Amino acid sequence: MELTDLLLAAMLLAVARLTLSSPVAPACDPRLLNKLLRDSHLLHSRLSQCPDVDPLSIPVLLPAVDFSLGEWKTQTEQSKAQDILGAVSLLLEGVMAARGQLEPSCLSSLLGQLSGQVRLLLGALQGLLGTQLPLQGRTTAHKDPNALFLSLQQLLRGKVRFLLLVEGPTLCVRRTLPTTAVPSSTSQLLTLNKFPNRTSGLLETNFSVTARTAGPGLLSRLQGFRVKITPGQLNQTSRSPVQISGYLNRTHGPVNGTHGLFAGTSLQTLEASDISPGAFNKGSLAFNLQGGLPPSPSLAPDGHTPFPPSPALPTTHGSPPQLHPLFPDPSTTMPNSTAPHPVTMYPHPRNLSQET
């Protein structure tokens, strides 16, 4: 391995050490500029040790490295960045073109090390300024190899130095600012879990109840009354979605259990064909849509059930048996949980069940 390759590897390792030891960009570290100035001066001093340094056979184009502070202040930040990136890129092309004209020699080895320093500077500037389109500035043609080394030193002492010292702090702060991703839209989904629990977990899953009337009664005109409650709707709201007199009037325990009493005037049949297993909560709290009525017992004081048991229908598709509780006749005597004797219930005084 040649000495040039070893020096290039050493410079790359030095840049990597600067990058790892400092959280900022390499161009924001002042040690990088000092290192490049020191190395370029040392490399140029070694050129005098090479014997027989002849001029180049073909002149190479180098950037104009003269610097004017007044002209520099009038330029915008973007034009300054393009000017410096263009100058460093053009210098790298000139060094590579000059090295391509030479046979392996002392000068060729020094030009290889010089190209490594220029690449290091170009990479650091691109990391700070970005890969902008270089601005084609003024150029000069040179045959003297010393002009290659002097061009790098003048760039470092002039435009690059002023850029890093004057514009550098602002660019470094702008580059190191954390980029916080702000969501473009906020979800407007309102979950029912945020509402206070007013029904004590009575109903928590989907259920549907279908009521059909077969004869004259209070609800004879309602041929297909259907109630659908979404998951957790009754569990998280403060009032019941269905507040109709005569429906699920005095339930005690789960609706799909055996203790529920459905009080109606002339409603004959209540089909619960759409009740899925586990649709109702297994608690024993009363689901009272007409507040003020005490829960009715399942057995009368005399030991007889107030209503005949409901016939069970055959199940289909492996579903649980569906209950069809019958509504009692309005003249049926029902026990009262507080009174010692049964109390007779009568239909509502308003007769809305006349057939038209």
Curated annotation (Swiss-Prot):
Write down any Gene Ontology CC term: extracellular space
According to the record, the residues making up region (Disordered) are 291-356
UniProt entry keywords in alphabetical sequence:
Cytokine, Disulfide bond, Glycoprotein, Hormone, Secreted, Signal
Secretion signal span: 1-21
Q: Which InterPro entries match?
A: 4_helix_cytokine-like_core (IPR009079), EPO/TPO_CS (IPR019767), EPO_TPO (IPR001323), Thrombopoietin (IPR003978)
| Disulfide linkage | C28-C172, C50-C106
> Highest taxon of the source?
Eukaryota
Sugar attachment sites are N197, N206, N235, N249, N256, N336, N351
Q: Does the keyword Secreted apply?
A: yes
Gene Ontology process terms (BP): cell population proliferation; megakaryocyte differentiation; myeloid cell differentiation; positive regulation of ERK1 and ERK2 cascade; positive regulation of hematopoietic stem cell proliferation; positive regulation of megakaryocyte differentiation; positive regulation of phosphatidylinositol 3-kinase/protein kinase B signal transduction; positive regulation of protein phosphorylation
Report the locations given in the UniProt record. Secreted
Q: List where Polar residues composition bias occurs.
A: 330-339
Q: Name one Pfam family in it.
A: EPO_TPO
Q: What induces it?
A: Expression in the liver and bone marrow displays diurnal rhythmicity (a circadian rhythm that is synchronized with the day/night cycle).
Tissue localization of expression is: Found mainly in the liver, kidney and skeletal muscle.
A GO molecular function assigned to this protein is: hormone activity
Gene3D superfamilies, per database record: 1.20.1250.10
**UniProt family annotation:** Belongs to the EPO/TPO family.
The domain comment in this protein's record states: Two-domain structure with an erythropoietin-like N-terminal and a Ser/Pro/Thr-rich C-terminal.
Q: Any idea what job this protein has? A: Lineage-specific cytokine affecting the proliferation and maturation of megakaryocytes from their committed progenitor cells. It acts at a late stage of megakaryocyte development. It may be the major physiological regulator of circulating platelets.
Q: What is this protein called?
A: Thrombopoietin
Query: By which gene is this protein encoded?
Result: Thpo
